[in-house]
Amino acid sequence: VDERGQWWNATERLIHEGILFFFKSNLYRAADGRFFIRSEFGDRTETGWLRAVRGFPIFADRALVEPERGVVRLVLDNGLILERRGEQLSVGDADLVWTDLLPSEQHPALGERSVPVRLRPGAMSSLAAFLEEDGEHWALNLGGEKQTLAEKIPDFTSDPGR
C-alpha cells in the first residue's frame, strides 16, 4: 500500500473493486506491526503478508454525525461501520483526520494491533459544521459537548523483531 492508499502487487496497481474490498475486509495487523490478509476457502486457510504499508490501507467513505448521541458513525470502504467519539479521532500531519480500527472491531478478531483508517474528503465534509479549532487543538462540538481530537501521527511501521 503506497503513501496515497493505493494497493499494488509488485508493479501492478490493484484497481478491481471486488478484490480490493476482499483484501480490505480481511486485513489484520500482527503484534509486530506487520499487516496480513487472511483468506478462508472452506476448510482451507491462507495468510498473505504485505511487504510494505506506507499509507492508509482502509478509508472511511462517509461520516454520519449524531450530535444528540455525541458520536460519529464512520462507514468504511471494507463494509464495517465504526462508532466514534471525538476523542477516538486523531489529527495527523496536514490536518489529516483518522482513527484506529481496533482488532476487537474486526470479525473474526485475528489481529493484535489496530489498523489506521483515514477519513476521505466526503467524510470530512460531514464533520465540517461540527469541527472547531482553537489555535492549538481540533474538537468536535456535538450536542454542546466539546470533544477534543487526539494529535497523533499514524504508525505504519512494523517491528518483526518484537
Positions of PLM-derived features:
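Long, non-globular segments of proteins
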Residues: 1-162
